[in-house]
Structures are given as structure tokens and as C-alpha cells.
């Protein structure tokens, strides 16, 4: 069986090599690149992201990343956003009172978490969506690794999307599965066996 090809999009943000290694461990053939043709033709595209929403969007625009993601989604070709790579799929992010437009695939804003300790850093359980492909077969007490200060805290998109939630004082979206577009707020590449299972399920679905 031929390995599925995955591009980890290199736009200056994210744990590129750790994502590459994690995907390779679940059987994917992985390239880290900003090349448009490679990103468009791969079976799957991973959009990582760490740091500020605005900085990630600026980096994405430099390599026409918005267009790459949009054209893949329009063609039904799978895209997986991770951490800030999930956040930038929403309409906007609000940091320090400044609103930055996102890719706009999902309506709504990514806003700061309200909790005594920020960032939310460490392991947490999730309430996975019924029928989820990403979390299929995982125990309800499976834990995932989060490092973030901002999140999408409500869903205004398609009612058919599969939504997985986590709680850090208040609920926030931990993962979304919406046709060809999927995303996780946690880092699957840092989440041990549970994260590997999520990546394996995504690769298997390519």
C-alpha cells in the first residue's frame, strides 16, 4: 500500500520537524515546504502554528497560504490545522484589543481564555464529538497536550460539523471536523499515544 503524502506547510511558524516526525511515525510520507505545487498536490496538508495570531497570518500571506488552504478546501482536499493553525481558520483573532482577519473558513472570533492562570499549558481531557473520525476508538479519559492563551469558545459554523470540546475554567473548541477541513487546538505531535492515534486516523482518511 502506497504511503499517503503529507505536506507540513512552512510559513515560519509551528513545530515543523516534530509534526513531520509524528506524521512519519504513523506511516505518512512527509515533506516540510512552502512550495505551492507540493502543498496543493499532497494527499493532506498540515497547517501548524505557534505564537501570535497576527504573526501567523502575516507569515501565511507571504507564501500565499490563504489561497493554498482555500483552494484545497474548495476541491475537497484534506487540511489539518494545529494550535494557532486551527485558530487562523476562523474569521478573526482578537489579541490585546486588536482584531486581525483570519482565513475565514469558519465564522467567529478567537479570543483570550478567561482563567486564573494563562496560558493553558499541560494535559487535558476532551469531550469528543459523536461520530468523530479523529477520535474514533480512543478512551474517554484520553489526554492531550495544550499550550495556548486564546481559543474559539463558541461555534457559529455549519451545524453538520463535528465539534470536540475541552474545558479550562470555561469550554472551548478542542477540535473541529468539517468536511475536508479539520483542526485541533491541542498539539497531537506532543500528545503521546492519544495524539498519534488522532494523526493516524487523519492520515488513514486521506
From Swiss-Prot:
Its UniProt pathway annotation is: Amino-acid biosynthesis; L-histidine biosynthesis; L-histidine from 5-phospho-alpha-D-ribose 1-diphosphate: step 5/9
InterPro entries on file = Class_I_gatase-like, GATASE, Imidazole-glycPsynth_HisH
| Catalytic activity, reaction form | 5-[(5-phospho-1-deoxy-D-ribulos-1-ylimino)methylamino]-1-(5-phospho-beta-D-ribosyl)imidazole-4-carboxamide + L-glutamine = D-erythro-1-(imidazol-4-yl)glycerol 3-phosphate + 5-amino-1-(5-phospho-beta-D-ribosyl)imidazole-4-carboxamide + L-glutamate + H(+); L-glutamine + H2O = L-glutamate + NH4(+)
Q: Name one GO biological process term.
A: L-histidine biosynthetic process
What EC identifiers does the entry list? 4.3.2.10, 3.5.1.2
Q: Name one GO cellular component term.
A: peptidoglycan-based cell wall
Q: Where is the Glutamine amidotransferase type-1 domain?
A: 5-206
Q: Where in the cell is it found?
A: Cytoplasm
Q: Name one GO molecular function term.
A: glutaminase activity
Question: Keywords on this record?
Answer: Amino-acid biosynthesis, Cytoplasm, Glutamine amidotransferase, Histidine biosynthesis, Hydrolase, Lyase
* A Pfam family the protein falls into: GATase
The active site is formed by 83, 187, 189
Question: What the protein does?
Answer: IGPS catalyzes the conversion of PRFAR and glutamine to IGP, AICAR and glutamate. The HisH subunit catalyzes the hydrolysis of glutamine to glutamate and ammonia as part of the synthesis of IGP and AICAR. The resulting ammonia molecule is channeled to the active site of HisF.
Q: How does it assemble?
A: Heterodimer of HisH and HisF.
Q: What name does the UniProt record give this protein?
A: Imidazole glycerol phosphate synthase subunit HisH
Organism equals Mycobacterium tuberculosis (strain ATCC 25618 / H37Rv)
The lineage, from the top, is:
Bacteria, Bacillati, Actinomycetota, Actinomycetes, Mycobacteriales
Amino acid at each position: 500500500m502506497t504511503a499517503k503524502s503529507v505536506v507540513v506547510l512552512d510559513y515560519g511558524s509551528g513545530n515543523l520537524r516534530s509534526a513531520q516526525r509524528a506524521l512519519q511515525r504513523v506511516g505518512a510520507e512527509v515533506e516540510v515546504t512552502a512550495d505551492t505545487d507540493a502543498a496543493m498536490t499532497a494527499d493532506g496538508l498540515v497547517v501548524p502554528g505557534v505564537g501570535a495570531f497576527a504573526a501567523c497570518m502575516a507569515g501565511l500571506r507571504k507564501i500565499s497560504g490563504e489561497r493554498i488552504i482555500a483552494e484545497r478546501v474548495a476541491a475537497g482536499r484534506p487540511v489539518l490545522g494545529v494550535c494557532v493553525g486551527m485558530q487562523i481558520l476562523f474569521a478573526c483573532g482578537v489579541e490585546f484589543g486588536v482584531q486581525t482577519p483570519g482565513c475565514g473558513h469558519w465564522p467567529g472570533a478567537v479570543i483570550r481564555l478567561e482563567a486564573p492562570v494563562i496560558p493553558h499549558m499541560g494535559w487535558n481531557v476532551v469531550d469528543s464529538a459523536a461520530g468523530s473520525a479523529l477520535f474514533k476508538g480512543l478512551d474517554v479519559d484520553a489526554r492531550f497536550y495544550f499550550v495556548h492563551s486564546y481559543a474559539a469558545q463558541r461555534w457559529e459554523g455549519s451545524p453538520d460539523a463535528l465539534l470536540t470540546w475541552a474545558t479550562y475554567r470555561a469550554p472551548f473548541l478542542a477540535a473541529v471536523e468539517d468536511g475536508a477541513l479539520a483542526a485541533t487546538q491541542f498539539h497531537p505531535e506532543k500528545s503521546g499515544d492519544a495524539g498519534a492515534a488522532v494523526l493516524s486516523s487523519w492520515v488513514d482518511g486521506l
